[in-house]
Structures are given as C-alpha cells and as structure tokens.
Amino acid sequence: MKSWCTPLYEGTFSVGLDKKFFSIPRDGNAAKGALKISLNPFLVVNEKRVILIDTGIGSFGEDTGVERLFENLERHGISDYEVTDIFMSHLHYDHMGGLAHQNSGFWELSFPEAKLWVSKDDWARVMAKEEFYDAEKTEFVAFLDARAKLHFLEAEDQPYPEIRVEHIGGHTQYHQAIWYTDEDLNLLMAGDVIATRGQVNRIFAAKYDYDPEQSKRQRIRLAREAYEVGATILAYHDEECSMFRIVDHDAQRGYVTEPVSGGRP
C-alpha cells in the first residue's frame, strides 16, 4: 500500500489572554484582543503503522471533546484501537489534550494500543511541576504517566526508519521537529515553530515563545531545509492550508508555496 497523510481538522477557536479556547466558525472572527487559532492533528498511515502527530485539545476547550478526533479518524476508516503510534511536537494542552478523556466518568486512554513518543526531557519537566496548568490537567498528565505506553525520545532520535525527530526548542524548551520520509511521503511537522503557512515568509520573534530568537532561527532553517528536500510542511494551526510545500524562492516575494491535498491515494 502507498503511505498517506491527512489533517484532522478539529475546529477554529478564539483564544484570549486567559488561554481559554472558544469555538468559532472557520470563517469567523476572534473576540477583540484574542487570537484566531485552528487545530489540525495529523494522521499518517503506512503499511506497518497508523500514526498521529499531536492529538488536539480534547476536552480542555470550552465545549470540546475527543469525539471530534474519533469522528475524523472514522471518516478515514481508522478506529481508536488501530492507532499504533503518537508523536508529540511539544506538551501544550492544545496539542496533547486528545490523549485521554473522561467520557465514562474516569480517565481513559483515547488510543489504548498506541505507543506515545515524547521528548524525555520535556516529560521530566512536566512531571516535576507541582501543577500542570490546573488541577484537572495535572491529574491528566499523572494518568498518562501511569497508564500510557510512554517511549522517550532523545534530542536527536530515529525510532523508526521513516521517522526522525530533532530537538529544536524555541516555542517550548524541548520542542521537537518531526520528519517523516519514505518512498511516498516527505513530511516536516515543526509544531508551533512553523504553525501556519504564512510563517515561512515572516521573520519574527514571538513574545509567547519560550525562546523567541531560537524559534526565529529554527523557523528560517527548517523552512530552507524543507524547500531543499521538497518536504510537505504540516501546519498545525493553519485555518485554510494545513499541508503545503515550498516550490520556489523569489528575492522580492520570498518563498512561493502551494497547497498539498491529504488523504488516501
């Protein structure tokens, strides 16, 4: 079978300084002073594995739940028990919230058979905290620590022949870039370092990043490398074009990009 990748669009949200995620229409406007953010976990399927890259917000938004992620997977013929591996770019709750749920009144793994691949240093950082955001999220990560099939990644790691992970920092201290390469696909998922299509043509240092200058350096480097190797960039927070490729570079306009269609071949 041919390998394939698709975004699992989870919704668009208005996010204010309180970091609460309120659902809005895809073509709607964020509240005054808030950011408009879309969420797109990614599904990658090959002959041996069914892989998720990040898992959405789960129940940690206002009126959100893991059901949307399950429904998106079902549209592609995938059940929760068929997911073999989950790779996390970083451990912010809008990226990891779909890992577990309380639909039956107690915590359960959303993907019981999946190996959960996380940065070893990032997991140690989270577990060392007395509180992870709030009481509910602290309970959530403690449950994952006890019950998930955790597999820890070093700063430079290659858990499978087709998957390479590198520590890039920037947005968070131990943020990771995930490269996927086989005969059919060439992918880069850089989490919130390249979160949208437009960011490859913006040179900026964001105050919300752990290390804004590191994010800027890595964004420039990764965009250049993706262009050189012809990788499709997976943009987790893009509302319109979450998979795109850099096809050219113009001295005046910067990178020229084109959308990439996901889904089964």
Where are these predicted regions, by residue range?
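Core dinuclear metal-dependent hydrolase active-site scaffold
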Residues: 1-10, 41-45, 51, 155-183
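Metallo-beta-lactamase
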Residues: 58, 74-75, 110-167, 214-230, ...
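Short, electropositive alpha-helical surface patch
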Residues: 175, 243-262
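Zn-dependent metallo-beta-lactamase
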Residues: 1-48, 57, 221, 249, ...
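Active-site metal-binding motif and surrounding structural segment of the metallo-beta-lactamase
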Residues: 65-117
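Residue-level marker for buried hydrophobic side chains located in beta-strands
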Residues: 51-53, 87, 116, 187-189
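Histidine-centered divalent metal-coordination motifs
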Residues: 87-95, 171, 175, 237
